[in-house]
Curated annotation (Swiss-Prot):
It comes from Arabidopsis thaliana (Mouse-ear cress). Residues 705-747 are annotated as: Disordered. InterPro entries: Cullin_repeat-like_dom_sf, Exo84. Belongs to the EXO84 family. GO terms for cellular component: exocyst. Keywords: Exocytosis, Transport. The exocyst complex is composed of SEC3, SEC5, SEC6, SEC8, SEC10, EXO70A1 and EXO84. Component of the exocyst complex involved in the docking of exocytic vesicles with fusion sites on the plasma membrane during regulated or polarized secretion. Involved in polarized cell growth and organ morphogenesis. During cytokinesis, involved in cell plate initiation, cell plate maturation and formation of new primary cell wall. GO terms for biological process: acceptance of pollen; exocytosis. This is Exocyst complex component EXO84C. Residues 706-721, 729-738 have a biased composition (Acidic residues).
Amino acid sequence: MESSEEDDEYPFIESITPQSKIDSVHQSLTEKGIRKLCCELMDLKDAVENMCGDMRTKYLAFLRISEEAVEMEHELVELRKHISSQGILVQDLMAGVCREMDDWNRLPGDVHDAEVEEDPLPNEVTDPKSEFLEKIDLLLAEHKVDEALEAMDAEERSSPDLKGSVEMSSYKSAFMERKAVLEDQLLRIAKQPSICVAELKHALIGLIRLGKGPSAHQLLLKFYATSLRRRIEAFLPSCLTCPNTFPATLSKLVFSNISVATKESAAMFGDDDNPAYSNKVVQWAEREVEYLVRLVKENASPSETASALRAASICLQDCLNYCKVLEPQGLFLSKLFLVLFRPYVEEVLELNFRRARRVIFDLNETDEGLESPSDFVTILSEFAIASDTMMTDCSIRFMQIVQDILEQLTHLVVLHFGESVLTRILQLYDKYIDFLIKALPGHSDEDGLPELQDNTVLARAETDSEQLALLGAAFTILDELLPRSLVKVWKLQIENGGGEGENSAALNSSAAPELKEWKRHMVQAFDKLRNYFCLQFVLSFIYSREGLTRLDALIYLTETPDDLHLPSLPFQALFSKLQQLAIIAGDVLLGKEKLQKILLARLTETVIIWLSNEQEFWSAFEDESNPLQPSGLQQLILDMNFTVEIARFAGYPFKVVQNHASVVINRAINIFSERGINPQSSLPKTEWFTEAAKSAINRLLMGSEDASEPEEYECEEEEEDDHHIVLPEMDDDSDSEDTSSLSTVDSFESFASASMADLESPSFTDSES
């Protein structure tokens, strides 16, 4: 009962196929498939072997038939010789038989008739023209072209029928036919692909003797063109293994072939006496140069790689040198080569500088081919301590990629494409400057700066040290590293910069005027970064975080003068911030005193320029509802003189600052005069403002209100240091700028290291305290 229930519960168990049976079935099917496949492969192998055997048999049969054909040709030649000799024997036999028969049949009474009767057969047999033609036929049949040519030349010189006959006689026609056969044989010899140079020259000389000079000249040029193609086809597979040097080998093959062909043409055809041949050689050489340029383009590395630039440079250098060597032979190919090759070089330069932009501005981009010169890394890494390392990497990449591009250039590339290279370096540096400006605080899309194509965003340089490090890196590239690299390429003399250390290199602009113009534009590009930094620094000083201005006209309308004659609080703050910045600059820009003075002088200048252009500031003075006091004008003039004295005291180029301050003072005097205040009667003398400004600087440095007015320094006029970089707006005054007697490094350091109670939150001296 239980078993029946189990059978009812599992009725399908008997229909299950065991796994072993499944495995055996699949195994048998797999074995059958493999056996079938092996059989098919064996059949295919047998078929291939049979086909190879048939091909081998047919090839051997073909070779045997070819040999038999050659032997048959020789037998035919021998048979033709034999027939010719037998023909001569038959003619001799016939002549002898005719004479004997004539003797036998001659009777005594028929003497007169025999003398009158003409026998045409002996004349026909002894005709020299027929003998000559038969001789030529025999020589042509035996392919003895030299003997045939000599015989035909001799006959043509001696036979009057060939030399002076105007009408075409039968003999002359037969002679010209055989001459055409000889020409055809010489052409076939010259057109053989495996012919050597000696055999070719021999055949061409024969054609020239036959009066076929143009055909011979064409065959000569065709031979050298064909041999060049074969040599290049054998060389091209190795281009991938030597991408930098293959253009040099190609140019050597092409131009050496042109030179040999030109010499052979002149020797065989006398190109100097026949301009038609020389013109043909020039046209042929131009086609070969076009072929060379096309080969270089087709087989070069990708145009954006440094190896492509190196290959193009070597090719241009070698080709122009070869063109110069060919000029004594009457071939002037330099201009043609430059016209053909210039677009390719420009393309390679453009794509390499595009690669440079990717490597510099896309910090995720890597270029394993770039080396890391220790001098670049060491010099620029000094700024990594004070700034973000990503920004320093950007500067290092800039110099690495530019140096890598410059190292690929040869002397003649610099000569013909130097201006283009300088322009692209300028554009790259300008992009680099825009890239750094994006890292400065205050940058926005409304600043009028061109957007970079990449989306890489640097971390903001928030602190003064980080911002100064950016400026220092950009200035070092401009003033030291780029000139040093260009000097090596342009092969100019290096001039030490005097106050900038032994490693400072300047370009000898008198030797390369384009470098002088390029340097001027590079300085202008750097000025964008410098001016943007100065503007943001001044704006952060003038405006509070709430957007309120600290430098307001109310300080000249409401505040009362004090007995200490100190500058207003905003200008005391300016003095403090400049002290603080000078200390930071002394650490970050160590050894870059030139840049420090440029920046700090520009900062003082920017403050006055902003004040001069701030219409809201001047509107407060022009508003008649605001009462004006002479003390306000006196305080404003004192602040301007104080700003000028800051620059003079620290040794900055202060002449431009003084000019801008004069503009502000004159404008203020005019406004106050229009409002009824007489400056002549209400203001002290000019010397008073100068002394008061000097005294204020001393008081602020000493940090004491009770300090007497010490005569710490007196101004002396001396020429500005000639070794300093003079900005474009300072060129007119560079030779006559006045600096303080403290315009030395010591005085600058004393200014930078002046004791401050708290540089972060300085305490200003208020006249009301």
